[in-house]
Protein backbone atom coordinates (compact mmCIF):
# COMPACT_ATOMS: atom_id res chain seq x y z
CA UNK A 1 0.00 0.00 0.00
CA UNK A 2 0.87 3.68 0.00
CA UNK A 3 2.19 3.37 3.55
CA UNK A 4 4.93 1.10 2.26
CA UNK A 5 6.26 3.88 0.01
CA UNK A 6 5.26 7.18 1.60
CA UNK A 7 5.94 8.42 5.10
CA UNK A 8 3.42 11.19 4.49
CA UNK A 9 1.33 12.79 1.77
CA UNK A 10 0.59 16.52 1.96
CA UNK A 11 -2.62 18.01 0.62
CA UNK A 12 -4.28 20.96 2.35
CA UNK A 13 -5.40 24.55 1.83
CA UNK A 14 -2.51 26.88 1.07
CA UNK A 15 -4.63 29.98 0.50
CA UNK A 16 -8.14 30.69 -0.71
CA UNK A 17 -7.28 29.68 -4.28
CA UNK A 18 -4.66 26.96 -3.83
CA UNK A 19 -3.88 23.60 -2.28
CA UNK A 20 -0.39 22.73 -1.09
CA UNK A 21 0.70 19.30 -2.17
CA UNK A 22 3.69 17.20 -1.38
CA UNK A 23 5.11 13.92 -0.23
CA UNK A 24 7.70 12.42 2.07
CA UNK A 25 9.08 9.20 0.63
CA UNK A 26 10.87 6.46 2.48
CA UNK A 27 14.51 6.54 1.28
CA UNK A 28 14.30 3.09 -0.32
CA UNK A 29 11.80 4.56 -2.81
CA UNK A 30 13.73 7.68 -3.86
CA UNK A 31 14.48 8.09 -7.60
CA UNK A 32 11.84 5.56 -8.69
CA UNK A 33 9.10 7.87 -9.98
CA UNK A 34 6.85 7.81 -6.92
CA UNK A 35 7.13 11.56 -6.29
CA UNK A 36 6.17 12.21 -9.93
CA UNK A 37 3.18 9.89 -9.56
CA UNK A 38 2.01 11.59 -6.36
CA UNK A 39 2.49 15.02 -7.95
CA UNK A 40 0.31 13.96 -10.90
CA UNK A 41 -2.41 12.58 -8.62
CA UNK A 42 -2.55 15.55 -6.27
CA UNK A 43 -2.36 18.10 -9.09
CA UNK A 44 -5.30 16.37 -10.78
CA UNK A 45 -7.24 16.54 -7.51
CA UNK A 46 -6.55 20.28 -7.16
CA UNK A 47 -7.61 20.80 -10.77
CA UNK A 48 -10.90 18.92 -10.18
CA UNK A 49 -11.51 21.17 -7.16
CA UNK A 50 -10.85 24.26 -9.29
CA UNK A 51 -7.76 25.18 -7.25
CA UNK A 52 -4.16 26.01 -8.06
CA UNK A 53 -1.45 23.66 -6.81
CA UNK A 54 1.52 24.78 -4.69
CA UNK A 55 4.71 22.95 -3.79
CA UNK A 56 6.94 24.39 -1.06
CA UNK A 57 10.42 23.08 -0.38
CA UNK A 58 13.52 24.27 1.41
CA UNK A 59 16.25 25.37 -1.02
CA UNK A 60 18.30 22.24 -0.24
CA UNK A 61 15.52 20.00 -1.59
CA UNK A 62 16.71 20.25 -5.16
CA UNK A 63 14.91 17.05 -6.19
CA UNK A 64 11.55 18.49 -5.08
CA UNK A 65 12.24 21.75 -6.93
CA UNK A 66 13.15 19.77 -10.05
CA UNK A 67 9.89 17.79 -9.84
CA UNK A 68 7.89 21.00 -9.43
CA UNK A 69 9.48 22.57 -12.52
CA UNK A 70 9.14 19.37 -14.56
CA UNK A 71 5.41 19.31 -13.81
CA UNK A 72 4.95 22.89 -15.00
CA UNK A 73 5.05 24.71 -11.67
CA UNK A 74 6.51 28.23 -11.75
CA UNK A 75 8.83 29.60 -9.09
CA UNK A 76 7.10 32.42 -7.19
CA UNK A 77 9.69 33.30 -4.57
CA UNK A 78 10.50 32.41 -1.00
CA UNK A 79 8.15 32.32 1.99
CA UNK A 80 9.15 31.34 5.52
CA UNK A 81 12.46 29.92 4.27
CA UNK A 82 10.83 27.75 1.59
CA UNK A 83 10.88 28.12 -2.17
CA UNK A 84 7.32 28.37 -3.48
CA UNK A 85 6.27 26.86 -6.82
CA UNK A 86 2.73 27.30 -8.18
CA UNK A 87 0.78 25.66 -10.98
CA UNK A 88 -2.24 27.63 -12.10
CA UNK A 89 -4.97 25.10 -12.74
CA UNK A 90 -8.17 26.66 -11.40
CA UNK A 91 -11.26 26.51 -13.60
Segments and roles (model prediction):
Residues 19, 78-91:
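C-terminal "cap" of GNAT-fold acetyltransferases
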Residues 48-57:
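Conserved GNAT acetyl-CoA-binding A-motif
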Residues 7-16:
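Conserved donor-binding loop and adjoining core beta-sheet/short helix segment
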Residues 23, 31-46, 65-70:
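Conserved acetyl-CoA-binding loop-helix of GNAT-fold acetyltransferases
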Residues 69-79:
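Conserved acetyl-CoA-binding loop of GNAT-fold acetyltransferases
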Residues 15, 20-32, 58:
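A short, internal acetyl-CoA/4′-phosphopantetheine-binding micro-motif in the GNAT/acyltransferase core
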Residues 1-6:
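Short, small-residue-biased leader/transition segments that mark boundaries at the very start
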Amino acid sequence: GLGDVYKRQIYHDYDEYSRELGWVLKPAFWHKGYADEMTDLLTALARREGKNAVIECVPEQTASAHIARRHGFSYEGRADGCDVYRLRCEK
